[in-house]
């Protein structure tokens, strides 16, 4: 399963986006029932757009009513768009997700077939190789612009409401411009911005504040959003595909009312900064090379460990929360890449202030400040052991009281 995966947009169109779609073509939806798919006769439009937060959206809307039935956020390598060769009665395409059995079927409504292959190629290109977001102009202004996000209060609100997916996006190569942002904050720096006694104010900011920050509801979900507005079906063109088609070929966080902060603001500011120097923690450790499938296998075989990890699995109709999914998630290329990204960011010695925002113990924050991954891991393990002891002691006390 992909750790970056896909999830529906909370409110389609609520975030700023380019006025022009990356690719669009007329196509109808198809519903999957058992092993066959049947066409939805409404006139539709498939389009891909990149919103101001740099995320790629795969959308389908009814051309008659204008309502958007599907608005899915797609990450690279999540899915593949291809033609269903088994269907000979129409031009049927499937958006097949590489993790799970989720599939979305569409039938072409373009009058000519000459651009079908081009549309298919462009869909795959933009989904798996999205354009790089435009960086903010002006060097050396990162600290000032970060201050404009609202200082400690605003950043804490933003970071506290981030999902796992968004945090990985923030510290990833796109969000951080090659892990350059955190280490390049000098002067007041990230430490003073996150650890100051009060919020920093600014009269202006390079990023728009007209929109409220929207946080996706889960890290990975394959469900689509269905609008409640009634839709008037339109007559199907003569090329409507046959009902029987084999399906075997594929499948807002609230911020301060006076200072709405967007994840894209922080991302764009960090993306303009320079790559940090190596932290003080000595030789850099890549967690991806440590937490290998071979090492994790006996740990994941423990039923107690599985039970503790299960609630953190992505949820969705085609994403069962099972022990197998835990294994699939931790061994996926996306998860391994996220580990490497986090290792590099932690080794930079600049994640201490960020870690303190998540309520981590002082030892862990100190290790993060030094870029000492080994000390950070030991601090986290010590904290976990202490919590387990406290929980066990509390349970024993409750049992003793019940006996009395």
UniProtKB/Swiss-Prot annotation:
One of its GO terms (biological process) is proteasome assembly. It is found in: Cytoplasm; Nucleus. Keywords: Cytoplasm, Nucleus, Proteasome. Residues 128-149, 195-258, 376-404 are annotated as: Disordered. Residues 248-258 have a biased composition (Polar residues). It comes from the Eukaryota. GO terms for molecular function: endopeptidase activator activity; proteasome binding. The keyword Nucleus applies. The keyword Signal does not apply. Residues 386-395 have a biased composition (Basic and acidic residues). Disulfide bonds: none annotated. Residues 278-390 form the DEUBAD domain. GO terms for cellular component: cytoplasm; nucleus; proteasome complex; proteasome regulatory particle, lid subcomplex. Residues 17-130 form the Pru domain. Residues 195-247 have a biased composition (Low complexity). Component of the 26S proteasome, a multiprotein complex involved in the ATP-dependent degradation of ubiquitinated proteins. This complex plays a key role in the maintenance of protein homeostasis by removing misfolded or damaged proteins, which could impair cellular functions, and by removing proteins whose functions are no longer required. Therefore, the proteasome participates in numerous cellular processes, including cell cycle progression, apoptosis, or DNA damage repair. Within the complex, functions as a proteasomal ubiquitin receptor. PANTHER family: ADHESION REGULATING MOLECULE 1 110 KDA CELL MEMBRANE GLYCOPROTEIN (PTHR12225), PROTEASOMAL UBIQUITIN RECEPTOR ADRM1 (PTHR12225:SF0). Belongs to the ADRM1 family. Component of the 19S proteasome regulatory particle complex. The 26S proteasome consists of a 20S core particle (CP) and two 19S regulatory subunits (RP). This is Proteasomal ubiquitin receptor ADRM1-B. It comes from Xenopus laevis (African clawed frog). The gene is adrm1-b.
């Amino acid at each position: 399963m992909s750790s970056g995966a896909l999830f529906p947009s909370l409110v389609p169109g609520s975030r700023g986006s380019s006025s022009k779609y990356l690719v669009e073509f007329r196509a109808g939806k198809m519903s999957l029932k058992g092993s066959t798919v049947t066409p939805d006769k409404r006139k539709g439009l498939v389009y891909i757009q990149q919103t101001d937060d740099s995320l790629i959206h795969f959308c389908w809307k009814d051309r008659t009513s204008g309502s958007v039935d599907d608005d899915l956020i797609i990450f690279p390598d999540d899915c593949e768009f291809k033609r269903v060769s088994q269907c000979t009665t129409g031009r049927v395409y499937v958006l097949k997700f590489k993790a799970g059995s989720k599939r979305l079927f569409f039938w072409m409504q373009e009058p000519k077939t000459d651009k079908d292959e081009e549309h298919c190629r462009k869909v795959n290109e933009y989904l798996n190789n999205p354009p790089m977001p435009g960086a903010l102009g002006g060097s050396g202004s990162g600290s000032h612009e970060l201050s404009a996000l609202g200082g400690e209060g605003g950043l804490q609100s933003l970071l506290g409401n981030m999902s796992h997916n968004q945090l990985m996006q923030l510290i990833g190569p796109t969000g951080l411009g090659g892990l350059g942002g955190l280490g390049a904050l000098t002067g007041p720096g990230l430490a003073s911005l996150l650890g100051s006694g009060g919020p920093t104010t600014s009269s202006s900011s390079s990023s728009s504040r007209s929109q409220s920050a929207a946080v996706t509801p889960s890290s990975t979900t394959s469900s689509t959003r269905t609008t409640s507005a009634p839709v008037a079906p339109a007559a199907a063109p003569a090329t409507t595909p046959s009902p029987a088609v084999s399906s075997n070929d594929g499948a807002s966080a609230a911020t301060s009312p006076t200072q709405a902060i967007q994840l894209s603001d922080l991302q764009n500011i960090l993306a303009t900064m320079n790559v940090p120097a190596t932290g003080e923690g000595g030789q850099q450790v890549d967690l991806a090379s440590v937490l290998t499938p071979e090492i994790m296998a006996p740990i994941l075989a423990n039923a107690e460990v599985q039970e503790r990890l299960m609630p953190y699995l992505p949820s969705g109709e085609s994403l069962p929360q099972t022990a197998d999914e835990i294994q699939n998630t931790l061994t996926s290329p996306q998860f391994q890449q996220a580990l490497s990204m986090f290792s590099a960011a932690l080794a930079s010695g600049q994640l201490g202030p960020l870690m303190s925002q998540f309520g981590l113990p002082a030892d862990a924050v100190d290790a993060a400040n030094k870029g000492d991954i080994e000390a950070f891991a030991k601090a986290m393990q010590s904290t976990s052991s202490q919590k387990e002891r406290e929980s066990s002691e509390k349970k024993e006390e409750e049992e003793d009281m019940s006996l009395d």
